[in-house]
Amino acid sequence: MDEQRERFSSRLGFILISAGCAIGLGNVWRFPYITGQYGGAAFVLVYLLFLVILGMPIMIMEFSVGRASQKSAAKSFHVLEPKGTKWHLTGYAAMAGNYLLMMFYTTVGGWMLAYVMKMLTGEFVGLTPDEVGGVFDNMLAQPGYMTAWMIVTVLIGFFVCSLGLQKGVERITKVMMSCLFIILLALCIRSITLPGAGEGIAFYLIPDFHRMVEAGLGEVIFAAMGQAFFTLSLGIGAMSIFGSYISKDRSLTGETLSICALDTTVALLAGLVIIPACFAFGIDAGQGPGLVFVTLPNIFNQMAAGQLWGALFFIFMSFAALSTIIAVFENIISFAMDLWGWERKKAVVFNVIMIIILSMPCVLGFNLWSDFAPLGAGSTVQDLEDFIVSNNLLPLGSLLYLLFCTSKHGWGWDNFITEADSGEGLKFPKALRFYCTYILPLIILFIFVMGYWQKFFD
């Protein structure tokens, strides 16, 4: 065991930071939309089922590998793999996944910060709906402006990490996550008290099995599976690092349950902000960047004190993006520290330069390189980077973590259970061995294959 390993100062720090890593933009711009589309609370029940049987076991395995090895993904497999095996190659894929994720996430984080400023300075006041959409298009067309905000995002993230695990990452993420919840609750109260919001609340929360059947049960199940899987940032070792920073006082199943509960709470509350507000103003919610950067600014424009609520919303979105960015930057820094024995400050300086350079193709893909459509007409560099991470590295990485923890040729089931169950709290059900070894890998392979099918053949 590494005696110099940094530690979280509290259990709350570990739970909030891990939840911060999981809570990302998909909680806001995808979850409310698919929940409304696929039957409201009926869909949420299916989603929660898959969160428990699909997302949680893999997260527990990632934490176990991190805690047992006391290393980041770069070295954890080296420490735990049986001699002569090649499991450590998974670590290099995980490292690539963290860098690739940040190659486009930093740009989107920059958009959020830019929109906080736009809201505070009243840039949207008096604009028509088309003009509001034009603000976003205009931003995408300016490589210099987007680069500046991307660099600000990178510098904020690495500055927090440079202060150290307890004084930086833990202390600042705790404050940020607390503010995120307070702002989210305030936005919720405002949204559900808008005139005409009741219809939206009913659409979002009342189970509608007819809507579910209409959409097709297979499609609903796959959407729930995908959301449960992708919401937790699994498969690239992003969670594993936080396992290496905690003691063996608590079992990992109970901690994972708390993290998943926080992630789901944010997703559900985000829906209570968005869906009732869209219904109140008779606007189709939609999903993705269009929802956040065009639909919602139009709603804030029509709302009393809309400038204030709009600014609060984009501060909330900035915190959601930055909590993930800081968590992944902590991973990226720890790779250099584990592999080359660097000091934290040196790892920070090296990676600031690396991430800024690596983030440029995403920025330029919206303007100077917009003719480059890697995944077919209308696609961008960002779509390609997202596809590599979401459709390939996350499912395949999760599959490798799973096989490593269940196969006798890897770390093995007994070692995994011993680690996961160390400490007080909820234990991992040993009866799930057959399910985890034989059925769960097939579910992940199904998600992987269906991702390709939807992308290229649907």
Question: Language-model segments: what does each one mean?
Answer:
Residues 7-18, 43-46, 85-99, 147-153, ...:
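Select transmembrane alpha-helical segments in multipass membrane proteins
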Residues 90-93, 340-352, 386-444:
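C-terminal membrane-solvent junction of multi-pass transporters and transport-like membrane proteins
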Residues 12-50, 237-243, 254-257, 261-262, ...:
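Transmembrane helix-boundary motif of multi-pass solute transporters/channels
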Residues 6, 35-61, 145-146, 394-398:
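Extracellular loop-to-transmembrane helix junctions
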Residues 2-6, 34-38, 68-93, 106-166, ...:
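Inter-helical loop and helix-membrane interface segments of multi-pass membrane transporters/permeases
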Residues 2-4, 8, 170, 174-322, ...:
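Membrane-embedded translocation segments of transport machinery
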